[in-house]
Amino acid sequence: MNVKDIMTEEVICAEVPGSSDQALNLIITHNVTGLPVIKKGTKELMGIISKTDFSRNPSEGQLALLMTKSVITTTADTDVKDAVKTLLVAGIKRLPVVDGENNIMGIVTSEDLVWKVVSKLDTDEKVTSYMMKSFTAVWKDTPLKVASEIMRLSGSRALLVLDSNAKLYGVLTDTDMLRVA
């Protein structure tokens, strides 16, 4: 199976020149964790922007200064197993699919792989073999600004929220944090 068999072809992209507010609005509106950034009026890939980029420099208004310019990409003919290895080794969640001229053709995300590949595997393996065994937690009355800093410092995309009895009260995600912005 190749990347072209599972990639999303209708890619939501931010454009440069553009503002970080426009990109953040796209991320929130489309409920995604990041976007490829293309040159305005073309399909040429210029960078990628993720929720993490916003937390690193929340006051930056220019998308070109906030986005990651060195983007790891793949091609449509790449084997899915190789794309998975790339995502895991690089520690990234999305892999833009480009043609020979660096024009965006699609995107493969970790979610695509879960829904289109892993869910179809014929396996009886248990989740305990793959689950995270450590996590970061905060108390339910922790100020949002403090929780944001804890999330940034821990590298977590989600925090377990505990009540005064140390019982699970909820989960706070980086997407929840963006809704405040």
Which ranges hold each PLM region?
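Tandem CBS (Cystathionine beta-synthase) repeat/Bateman regulatory domains
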Residues: 1-181
